[in-house]
Amino acid sequence: MGIRGFLIGTASAMALLTGAAHAQTSDTTTAPDDGEIVVTGFRASLAQSIDAKRKADSIIDSVSAEDVGKFPNTNVAEALTLVPGVTVDRQFGQGEKVSILGTDPALNRTLLNGQTVASADWFILDSPGRTFNYALLAPQLVNRVDVYKSPEARIDEGSIGGTVNVLTRKPLELKPFVVAGSLGYLYNDRSEKGDVQGAALVSWHNDAGTFGLLASFQRAKDRLRRDGLESYGTITADFWAGKNDAGTSSITTGNCTAACATTLTANPGAKFPNAFGTSYFAQDRERLTYSATAQWKPVEELTITADWLRIDATYDNLNQSMYAFPGNVWNSAGSLTGLTVDNGVVTKASFRNALSVLDAQYRVAEMHSQTFHGQIGWNDVNWDLNIEGGVSDADGGTKKQVFLEFLNWADYTVDISGAPDKPGTLSYGSNVLGNPAAFATDPGWSGNLVNKPTIDKERYGQVDLGLKFDGSLKRWSFGYKYRHHETGQSYAGIALTGLSVPAGNFDTSPVKDNYLSGFDGINDQMAGRFIINGDSMVNYVQGRPNLPTPSMFAAAEFTAGNWNIKEDIQALYSQINFEQGALRGNIGARYVHTKTESAGFVCRPGAACNAQADWIWQTTTRSYDNVLPSVNVAIALQKDLTFRFAASQVIARPNYADMSNYFWLSDQIGTGGGGNPDLKPYESTNYNASLEWYFAPRAILAAEVFYKDIGNYILQKTAREQYFNQFVGAVTTYNISRPFNAGSAKVKGFAIAYQQSLPLGFGVLANYTYADGKGEDGADLPYNSRHQASLSPFFESGPVALRATYTWRSKYFTGIDRGDQMYVRDSANVDVSATYNITKEIGLTLSGMNLTDSQYYAYANTQRLPRGVYKNGRKLLATVNVNF
């Protein structure tokens, strides 16, 4: 790694306190020293963001509570879309993962009041990781969000891209008595359903300002439907010519003669979707958030704070995928009748008597998180002391999955020749997609019952001491922090067998008329498919006599999916803040000792992995030490021009799932993957510099450059390995994906930001970021969009406020799936909001989110091989806000 430079910090304590005060009083008019009257409302809150950035020692961007309230969003991630260098992933229609300066979301940290909060995901295919799920955080909690693009020694380590610190409201920072609330209705035009939203906050403190209480509650419910086209892995054309592991063709060449046979012989490596069809995903998301804060200030220097936060969220969902499956070995009776290949891709293939599948999965998914935090702060003239501690627990995942699989054999054609604009067409000789009687379960394997819960726990304590000085040395701070983190998942299931029942027995119905609206190239068969009733399916399965109980030893994939990670972290730091004339900044270092314990089930070598005795619980322990120096310098070149430079050495620990002993195999398609407990942390030398021109009141034009030299970069690698295949009953070859420290990577780029409040109530925010991230041999880095841009014009005058937000990001790599390089195509998003303040205390807001119903297009290797193409619908939100 590079030199041990010294890195940068963030906003000074005075700047942060000033920003907090302004954020809480943005509805009042203020007069700065030069006598200019500052506008109120949203324009004032933007001015506070500029002010916080200007006064900071480090490269930082802030979003105030007024910003969050004005954005047409459902979570905090959406409010960060206008921060230069920040991109958001919206697979399910709203921001859930945040990338900073071209780095993987797992390489960024999100803190709540400077601390890690336990959280969990709901999706059955997700594993516990370090990525924070922003969908869990209610915007009403937020006072301010600070995005640190360069670290300070005093701030928790673990981020290469940047650190997001979410600061919540405190009663002693508000007016003596505050009552605020909102009541609204959120409607999704794709699901054609809506529900009531509500939030309330009450804050009080005594006249002396020595004791205060705050309590808040929020209910958010989103009834979404995601329509899509999906494929599951890729196969090569020689799969149909007897080149698979069994030595026989999954589908016989059949009537593939003449030109078809010639094409097949000449293009053995041409790729084609292993399976392709339509997806129907329906979900009711409900999040209940409760919070309370008490503050006591018995003397001027001492402040004691206690915080409580609880989140209860449900994500029950019904997923129904209906697809042709030409790559399945059950197709021995099928035949290939036609084939078209273009530039290494099978663009069209026709089959006779080949397999189709309807997978119906009803999942009970939920997340609960509870955090207790205590803080004692003493702030004297010459010194200050901070003592903090807390406990944060979360559980989530899929508590129950009921899965039935229905099979059909028919003649069909899969045509992806129009991709990416026309992702694909599935055509049948007879319309089985609209015929529930044509699909039935197979008694040999009819489905399964699965539960896959997860846990996440955090324990922490810290002590910080600061000494204040006159002269160039302003403050010397040092401290100690201890963190204990535990995360893991359980995985149990049981196969359902002996069922022979048609799909028509489960209260089927045609999809709504708007199903797959906005997808080019689909046909009436796809748009008119049927769906089953989830409750009917669940009642049928759970009503079966002698229903087996899910077990972690029922199959290898379940056993291998049980793992646990424990992590103990101790940190010491020292930091000096300095100021001399036009020069200011900080210099410091952080020493960190990390000890990890990775445990999970591993199959004994040579065993069939189909009995409890074949498995052992294996624990791997490792530890490492890091010294992380940092320096930050800010120079006021002139009154309205500031130059900043930062250098640092940072680490990011491996994702929890990557560190585990987790291992899985898919016997039918010959793929698998798992974790690697011997992974080393990412290590990076970072350089940042910026030039900020405050050319007018409430205006900024800024340019920023960044360079990250990352070592021990972790990437998924795929290798061919042999394991016992329970489906085949013999040892076969699998494509196995595992994480490895693949070597080095570099991320470099620049960002340009412009913000200005214009005359007559108008204003604009705009930014562009270029981030070029490459690993060894030019490998793409996960979630690195080379280009990102956003534009947000606004108008605010009197009781009226209008705003539009446009964001765009270029394509990005997401990882390896079943041996394929996975990408997401470039996408754009448009949101608008309009507010009318009926009185000073009461306002009405209308918001439109995802107005273009943007398409999420994931693909394998090339855009001509779609993997998942989705639309989540537009959202309309009407809200009445009160604030007294």
Question: Each predicted region: which residue ranges?
Answer:
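N-terminal periplasmic "start-of-domain" segments of outer-membrane beta-barrel proteins
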Residues: 38-71, 97, 105-108, 120-122
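Extracytoplasmic beta-strand/coil segments of soluble accessory domains associated
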Residues: 77-120, 149
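Outer-membrane beta-barrel translocator/receptor signature
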Residues: 124-131, 140-147, 154-256, 260, ...
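Repeated loop/turn-to-beta-strand initiation elements of outer-membrane beta-barrel proteins
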Residues: 210-211, 301-304, 382-385, 473-476, ...
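Solvent-exposed loop segments that connect transmembrane elements
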Residues: 227-278, 318-360, 405-447, 498-512, ...
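Outer-membrane beta-barrel signature, preferentially recognizing the C-terminal barrel domain
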Residues: 354-369, 557, 561-568, 622, ...
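Gram-negative outer-membrane beta-barrel transporters
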Residues: 707-709, 719-721, 725-817, 852, ...
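C-terminal beta-signal and adjacent terminal beta-strands/loops
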Residues: 711, 808-815, 835-884
